[in-house]
Structures are given as structure tokens and as C-alpha cells.
Regions:
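Glycine-rich anion/phosphate-binding loop at the beta-strand->alpha-helix junction
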Residues: 42-154
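Internal helix-turn-beta structural module
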Residues: 140-205
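Glycine-rich and small/hydrophobic secondary-structure elements
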Residues: 17-23, 129, 178, 183
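Beta-strand segments within the central parallel beta-sheet cores of soluble alpha/beta enzyme folds
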Residues: 1-4, 51, 88-91, 197-202
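Residue-level signal for secondary-structure boundary elements
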Residues: 40-47, 85, 183, 192-196
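Short, mixed-charge aromatic SLiMs
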Residues: 2-11, 101-102, 154-157, 200-205
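Glycine-rich, mobile lid/loop segments that gate access to catalytic sites or pores
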Residues: 1-65
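Alpha/propeptide regions of enzymes that mature by internal proteolysis
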Residues: 31, 74, 173-175
Length: 205
């Protein structure tokens, strides 16, 4: 949803497969092209904010304490190179809202909101699992920086070779694969442990 200073005004997941940046807002492609041209000329890099949404996830996946679904998802995403933070649900506004505002009330036709991001108490609640994560700008860039040599003397360093101005672009299919693996693991575990348990929701989505 964001690369460097360019953020999406609207999110259309299908648009992500229609451009080389995996960006979900096609109206921002010109801005991205300009930014990357400047980054390449400057020998610099930027970070990115990415999102993964799991739709139609069964209710009941996960554990209440050990092997929480959100903990396993966070571990999988944090295992991707350059990832520095992971959030699930409406994490950005969690400090600005009261409990009465952020709770996901249940109606006869389903949840009224999805601030929890599809996971409550470490267990999937049947709603979409919304996961966001941030990737840092890579430090392997052509622009000169400071370091020390083996004797502790301050020297300049310049990385040569081919380096991406944003490694976040390459992380999109990796994140999808990581999330799929975690969901599949929990599906198999749930089938083994709770195969005969009625897990139907009391409402239709």
C-alpha cells in the first residue's frame, strides 16, 4: 500500500498483478516511475508497506496461548529479509480508539467491523485476516556511507554491483507463500485435533 513516499489512495488487490511494482493503485504508477528513476540516479533505496489478506479462512484455527495463529503469522513474516514490523487488523488506530469503538460487534449477518483483523485470542474468527508489514530500505546501496576498517579507523564505504532500490517489491509473492504455509499448517493441525467439532458460524456472512 506504500512504497517510499508514494502511498495508495485506494486499494484494489487485483491491480497488484498488473504492474511491475505489485502496487494496488494504478493511478500512482507515474509517481512510482519518477521516484525510482531518481533513486537509481542517486544510488539510494526506500522501504515499503505491504499487506496480505486471507479471505474465507475457517473459524477456529490457532491456539489460545502457545502457537497462536497471529504469532505464527508474525513469525513467518518476520522471517522474510528486511522486514522490521508486522501488524494485524486496525493496529494503526489502536491507541486512538476506546474499547467500545474498536470491538468487533457481532450482528445477525456477521461482524459489524474487523478491527481485530480476523483473529481474536490467537484463534481465527472466520473474518478476513488482514496483515500489514514494513520492509526497511536496503543499506546495500551505491551511495557512499561511513564505516570502520579492521583497525577501527573511520572510512568511506560504497557498495558496487546490482542492488534493488526497493526490496519490498520482491517480497509480495514471498509473503503470500509464507502466509499460505502457516494457514495450511493450522488447517492440518485443526483437522487432526478438532475434526469432529462443529465449527460453523451462527450467522451467514
Amino acid at each position: 500500500s506504500q512504497i517510499g513516499h508514494v502511498s495508495a489512495d485506494s486499494i484494489n488487490p487485483s491491480s497488484a498483478n498488473e504492474n511491475k511494482y505489485f502496487f494496488a493503485d494504478l493511478s500512482k504508477l507515474d509517481d512510482l516511475n519518477k521516484m525510482f528513476e531518481e533513486l537509481i540516479a542517486e544510488g539510494n533505496s526506500v522501504g515499503a508497506k505491504l499487506g496480505v489478506c486471507v479471505e474465507n479462512c475457517p473459524v477456529g484455527l490457532g491456539e489460545p496461548v502457545f502457537d497462536k495463529l497471529n504469532a505464527d503469522l508474525a513469525k513467518a513474516i518476520m522471517s522474510i529479509n528486511a522486514v522490521k514490523s508486522v501488524s494485524i487488523g486496525n493496529a494503526e488506530n489502536i491507541l486512538n480508539l476506546k474499547g467500545s469503538e474498536i470491538r468487533d460487534e457481532i450482528r445477525s449477518d456477521g461482524f459489524a467491523s474487523n478491527n481485530a483483523g480476523g483473529i481474536l485470542g490467537g484463534i481465527s474468527n472466520g473474518d478476513n485476516i488482514d496483515l500489514d508489514f514494513l520492509i526497511k530500505p536496503t543499506s546495500s546501496i551505491k551511495k557512499k556511507g561511513k564505516t570502520v576498517d579492521k583497525d577501527g579507523n573511520e572510512v568511506d564505504i560504497e557498495v558496487t554491483g546490482r542492488h534493488d532500490p526497493c526490496v519490498g517489491i520482491r517480497a509480495v509473492p514471498i509473503a503470500e507463500a509464507m502466509v499460505n504455509l502457516v494457514i495450511m499448517d493450522h488447517l492440518l493441525r485443526n483437522r487432526a485435533q478438532c475434526g469432529e467439532v462443529d465449527q460453523q458460524l451462527p450467522f451467514t456472512k
